[in-house]
Amino acid sequence: MTAQLLSAWWLIVAACCAATVYALSAAFTMPRLGSESLVREAARRARIRGHVPVSVLKPLCGAEPRLFENLATFCEQNHPSYQLVFGVSSANDPAIAVVRRLQAAWPHRDIELVIDSRVHGSNLKVSNLINMATRARYDTLVVADSDIAVERDYLGIVTAPLADPAVGVVTCLYRARHVGGFWPRVGALFINEWFAPSVRVAHSTGSRDFGFGATLACSRATLQRIGGFAALKDCLADDYLLARHAREHGLATVLAPVLVETDVTEPTFATLWLRETRWLRTIRSVNPAGFASLPITFTSPWLVLGASLVALYGPHGALAPASTAAGMPAAALAALAASTVGGIVARIALHVRGSTGW
């Protein structure tokens, strides 16, 4: 076997093994995140510490599937004092009717609807937030995307870390729920078995370089310190950048122990492709190093490649005589075999964890 071929072979082995190590880490790191016991304990500590009044900002655009059901979870919070501010940019937005239903269903809940067409920059969601922020009455703010569903103790849990003056932003990891047929299922797998595990791995290595639109909790003082929502009006990844700007001012980003749910509704391959490629472009723009590591974090192709090579070149493979004659290292085949077994275990664990939330 030539030196070049041997080097290429060992490079493939190294990549397959690295993907397996990553998959095992992703499957088994932070096992209690989002667990019932951890959430219950976090809620208990939040109650002991005392709840603060909260203004929840929910920018809306269109009547998404399950919009009423998702927004209703914010109306059912076990929190003594909070305000819900919903915002749309058009008087014809069908989300208005959903907000009116919420107001009728929870007449004693502090629910306000802001209809304001002013545009402040290229990011229309941030323009909506700028228009809504003036109606927020409390000094603790929570921003959450429209397709998010939460548990009853959510507000207390995500705002509790803000009592520490060193904390700037609290964010939440999320679990995907498919709404519809095959393609929404694929989109949910992308979140549950690739994106969420990558965040867990990054967090376990000490990284706090994230901020998710599923939840961004901060104080009004922190928001003003970074320039308000106006500082994000022309930014693509506004959620990520809000947390990063706070970190640039020496304030920590905290990942809350509670998981929220997000809906995946794209009905066709084309719409799902647009969503995922837009997401990947966003990652590339804000985290080039993380984007460069994507080939390893997509572990299934490496697992298939490793298994195929073992099947072909292993002791009972069709190309076993050729590999022996060429001097293919037995250690490389053994490493590939071990990597394949470990990768299969990791993929099964990732799927179970993504499906059940353990």
PLM regions with names:
Residues 1-48, 185-189, 197-201:
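N-terminal membrane-anchoring/stem segments of glycan-assembly enzymes
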Residues 28-30, 36, 297-358:
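Membrane-embedded multi-pass helical conduit in multi-pass membrane proteins
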Residues 52-55, 83, 241:
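Cell-envelope/extracellular polymer assembly enzymes that use nucleotide-activated donors
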Residues 80, 88-102, 118-120, 148:
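A conserved acidic beta->alpha catalytic loop
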Residues 101-138, 157-226, 230, 273-274, ...:
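Long helical/loop segments within the catalytic core of UDP-sugar-dependent glycosyltransferases
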Residues 144-161:
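Acidic donor-binding/catalytic loop of UDP-sugar-dependent glycosyltransferases
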Residues 234, 240-262:
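Catalytic donor-sugar/metal-binding loop of nucleotide-sugar-dependent glycosyltransferases
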